[in-house]
Every structure is written in C-alpha cells, then in structure tokens.
C-alpha cells in the first residue's frame, strides 16, 4: 500500500511543476483518476494495516451490541446496520467512508484553487490521506467538510459553513470543536494580530513545558467530559499514547513553518484570499497539540483535525519563492518530510524511523 501511495505522490509532484500549463481536460482527468485510485486503496486496504482498522472491522461486525454504540457515533452504527443487510465484509464500510471522505476533499481542493490541484494532492498524500481517510475514517468525512466550511466562511456564507460542521459532527463528534472558526474574520492580518497569533502558539508551548493543564475545566462539560475520561483511561492502561512531545522535531518544524507563513502573510494574502482564516486554524491546531497534551491521543486528533487546513496553507509557500519551479520543489521537500511521518502509521519508514508524529 505504501508503494502505491508513493507512486501517486511522485506523479503528483511531477505534475505540480507544470499543471498551470496543462489543458484543463487533462488536468481534471488525471485528478479524477488519482481520486478513484485513492478511494479504492482506502476501501480495499488490508485489515490491520493501520492501528484503527481492526477496531472498525470488529465494530462493523458487532454493530448490534451495546458496547459498539459507546465507541462510535450513531451514524457509524446506522451505516453499518444498512450495509450489513448486503454484506458482513468490513470493506463495505471502509469503501463508504473513503468514497465520501476522499471525493469531498478533492472537490474542496477545486474550490480553493484549480491551478494547484496536484500541489494540494501532494500535501494531502503526505500526511492526511493516511491519518484521516485510511486510519481515522470517520474523521475523513469530517475533515473534508471542514475544508469546505472554511471556503464558505471566506465567501461570506457562514450559515452554510455551520451546516457543513454540523453534518461533519454527525460522522465524528469532534467536529464540535471546529465551531469557533465560524467567528474568525478573514481580513488581512495586522501587525498586532501577527504578533498575537505567534505569541499564542509560543506561549502554549511554554505552558505545556511547565505542566499546565485545562483538564479540570473540560471534564465538567456534559458528554465532552465523558469522552475525555475515556481517553484518559485509555492512556492510563496503555491503549493510547501516554506521552506527547511538544518539543519533538515534527512539532517544532510545524511551528517554524507557521512563523514563516506569518512572516510572508502580506505576499500570500495577495495570492490566496483564504489565507487569513487558514493561518488562524493552523495556530489553533498547534495550540491544541500542546494544551491538550494531558491526553495525548485526544491532543493529536483535535490538533490535526484543525491542521487539515495546512493542505491548502503549506501549498501557499509557492507564493513566497521565485522562480516557480524552485518554489514547487521547496514545497514538495516539505511534503516529503511529512510523508515520512504519515507512512509510519502503516509501518513504512520512508526516510528515517519515527514513533509517528512525535
């Protein structure tokens, strides 16, 4: 499976160099073909390839048991109930989630910029394809709707963005943590705002290092508190990650890229009118990673849900470097760095072995 991902990744990298010169019919045909391949790869994957597929397969087969309803949303149980009328093969539900998760993301890419489709695909394949659409399949649909919601906010249709988030929460309740983006403005960042957002990211890292926690406050929220308790218990018994490294290479590089994007915010905003809200969601993702570090598994899931926006945002780096071929090459090297971490989840160390996204 990792080799198939690598093939599409390399082809997308090559096409990204001259996709602005490709006739639209060829560009969209190739993009559509890659999409079909990605859907089938997710849907027909070997059970056990990633950390979550065994659990999903078991839940699909035992959807009628009370314990299953405690582990997943009612939407998963409903879909499993319907699909079980036709087959008890878990690949049926993998295909269902892949069909909507992957196709909605590709549609979202076209809404942002149809001249950078393959560059978006490069960053999508580098991390979020494996983590969301192959592993955390419920989050796959949610994160796609999240990307669409951001676009609608930029276009002034916040009611539609709200609807996308609500629908996404139907597939994974963590979508509720995305509601604050509805209040984000999309105006170009002022100098003060740049310092504030950068300061918040750095401050969260300092608080994390000092042992700060917001667990005692969040635990009081109905339902959310129950979910937090389950995550905490899983960590205590070793079912989830027990530590999170806010000073690991992965996170520090992510912060460095955030600072770089802030520094070139004016130049990027001229080319991508989505930038102001995208950079704010990136900041939120970085903050959640450290502030929620007392429950590492939850911190990673919420953080990378917010950071799905980096598929678009990191591709904006091409607007900060001249000439274009150099810009594309640099962004693809960044994507290669993330790909090394993403493929770890399916047991394929590409460049060096890591513990995932430390």
Where are these regions (language model features)?
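Membrane-interfacial loop-to-transmembrane alpha-helix junctions, especially the N-terminal start
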Residues: 27-31, 269-282, 325-330
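TM-lumen/periplasm interface segments of multi-pass membrane proteins
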Residues: 18-98, 341-358
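Transmembrane-helix signature of polytopic, membrane-embedded enzymes
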Residues: 25, 109-126
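Membrane-interface transmembrane helices that cradle and orient dolichyl/undecaprenyl
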Residues: 146-160
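Alpha-helical transmembrane segments and terminal signal-anchor/GPI-anchor hydrophobic tails
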Residues: 54-58, 63, 73, 77, ...
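Short acidic/glycine- and proline-prone juxtamembrane loop motifs at membrane-interface regions
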Residues: 134-140
